């Protein structure tokens, strides 16, 4: 049985493919908008144009951290689960996410939902926009050191 909450959503899977995620690390994929498991030998299988790798949330989070220098920090407070995006190499805050807990008008309140939302937010951002924002943060840190 596939535990859907452990895997990225179809929307995230599409964006991961667009951003260059290596599908060979994933054992699940979306085909015809349905989450499926690979049956044949993984090394011989290549995703078709309309298929998307569906890695676990952790795999997607790790990929963002290692390839884009973006860490998704999920935490809980009285309002529910939240996320922040930080630079993976030094913890500098890049963006704050919104609370997705029931105290803020949502019906669900899970760590996995918020982690998926953070991954989606990070992937939706324009690469140029990220670079500009990170450069401003780095310049600010350098000024503060002087």
Each PLM stretch: what is its role?
Residues 1-146:
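Glycine-rich anion-binding surface patch
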